[in-house]
């Protein structure tokens, strides 16, 4: 009896349960990357494995609206809503970047009910490294 031919691109060959397994995570790390154009919020466990993430672009904001504080607040709320359902109570916050969404994202994180152990600014600062881009002339 001949074996059935498996299609390589079929979904039957993939593992289905490993994608959305619900782990109980009591403590995590919330990374906020706020640039002038977008804000990305990533929630990881203490070992650095990504649990949930969201950005202003995935929340439906396009163009210059992605860099606004309201877009950052919405992105932070979406990322945290998923991990609160998984049982996260405590978190550390690491904020990176000069964008407008820094404070708005932190405000949304505080309002979510997660206890914050500390808030750390991890923006990379050069010790006179590369030459910055030239000034804009509008």
Swiss-Prot record:
UniProt keyword terms in alphabetical order: Chloroplast, Plastid, Ribonucleoprotein, Ribosomal protein, RNA-binding, rRNA-binding
Keyword GTP-binding: no
Domain of life of the organism encoding this protein: Eukaryota
Lineage: Eukaryota, Viridiplantae, Streptophyta, Embryophyta, Tracheophyta
Organism encoding this protein: Nasturtium officinale (Watercress)
Disulphide-bridged cysteine pairs: none
Transmembrane segments: none
Ranges of biased composition (kind: Basic residues): 9-23
Protein name from the UniProt record: Small ribosomal subunit protein uS11c
PANTHER family found in the cross-reference section: 40S RIBOSOMAL PROTEIN S14/30S RIBOSOMAL PROTEIN S11
């Amino acid at each position: 009896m001949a074996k059935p031919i498996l299609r390589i691109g079929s979904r039957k060959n993939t593992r289905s349960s490993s994608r959305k397994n619900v782990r109980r995570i009591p403590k995590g790390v919330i990374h906020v990357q706020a640039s002038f154009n977008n804000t990305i919020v990533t929630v990881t466990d203490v070992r650095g494995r990504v649990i949930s993430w969201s950005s202003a672009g995935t929340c439906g904001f396009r163009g210059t609206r992605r860099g606004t504080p309201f877009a950052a607040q919405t992105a932070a709320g979406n990322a945290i809503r998923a991990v609160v359902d998984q049982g996260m109570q405590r978190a550390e916050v690491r904020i990176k970047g000069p964008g407008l969404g820094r404070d708005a994202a932190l405000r949304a994180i505080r309002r979510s009910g997660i206890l914050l152990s500390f808030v750390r600014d991890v923006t990379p600062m050069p010790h006179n490294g590369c030459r910055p881009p030239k000034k804009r002339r509008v």
